[in-house]
Curated annotation (Swiss-Prot):
Coiled coil: none annotated. This is Deoxyuridine 5'-triphosphate nucleotidohydrolase. Its EC number is 3.6.1.23. Pathway: Pyrimidine metabolism; dUMP biosynthesis; dUMP from dCTP (dUTP route): step 2/2. The keyword Iron does not apply. The lineage of its organism: Bacteria, Pseudomonadati, Pseudomonadota, Alphaproteobacteria, Maricaulales. Belongs to the dUTPase family.
Length: 152
């Protein structure tokens, strides 16, 4: 496992919250906390989504991205996920990170200040250099997609 230094800027509305942290020594992701006002929890009715601020901005080194992903416990227990998963935070983005949560569950879900709402993974980036081709290598799969390899 490797590490990379990442600058983090807690924003004014992040005051009093713990910085994102790895919960175990082998964790790939660190939890992001909701930076909503304590007196204004955010309600997410079934089938709807809300953009939740996390109160931090980061400066990733060139060649890295941050991926924002759902927390498995919220998905399993409440049907809460991220609308665009994984969400990508590019190395040159300097604004506040926000999480677009969606409620796939049957009950209203309330996000309170400090709730752990998503996880963030720091990952290396590989950029493609396109090579125009008239043909592509043949494979066993060919053009089969969307279930073409079966379900069992």
């Amino acid at each position: 496992m490797s590490t990379v230094p990442v600058k983090i800027k807690p924003l004014d509305h992040y005051e009093g919250l713990a910085l994102p942290a790895y919960e175990t020594p082998q964790s790939a992701g660190m939890d992001l906390r909701a930076a909503v006002p304590a007196d204004e929890p955010v309600s997410i009715p079934p089938g709807e989504w809300r953009l939740i601020p996390v109160g931090i901005a980061i400066a990733l080194p060139a060649g890295f991205e941050a991926q924002v992903r759902p927390r498995s416990g919220l998905a399993a227990k409440h049907g809460i996920s991220c609308v665009n998963t994984p969400g990508t935070v590019d190395a040159d983005y300097r604004g506040e990170i926000r999480v677009n949560l969606i409620n796939h569950g049957q009950a209203n879900f309330v996000v309170n200040r400090g709730d752990r709402i998503a996880q963030m993974i720091i990952a290396p980036v590989t950029q493609a250099v396109w090579e125009i081709a008239d043909t592509l290598d043949e494979t066993t799969r060919g053009t089969g997609g969307f279930g073409s390899t079966g379900t069992k």
